[in-house]
């Protein structure tokens, strides 16, 4: 797989735009990693005009913004479906700190088959809270990813 289209939630074109659930005030730059990761998938495989701005607007209009957090997991499947793409949830519980989880093998198999994987990362190497990233290649112990909050391409461990 070649590198997918890359978007940053902190891009000045949309970073300061509203991405707030009822009762909060936040922005795409602070909380829009999920729709930004999905925008990368959609712009790569379906419609190059899709941006984090358009995906955050769609997620907000359908109630997928979680108050005081980011985006509900349930957003991704319908977001893909409206462009004729299939999305599958591999896991819905935490596997934080579980190096031998079967979900790691499922994600690796998906990458080996040329699929993109949106992963929700817990506190650790890449984030201090929850954060969605787009995995697009695995080479040895190096994961190549598009992180909506970073320009760094490859991570190990």
What are these regions (language model features)?
Residues 43-157:
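Conserved active-site-adjacent core of cysteine acyl-enzyme catalytic domains
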Residues 1-69:
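Active-site-adjacent structural segments surrounding the nucleophilic cysteine of cysteine proteases
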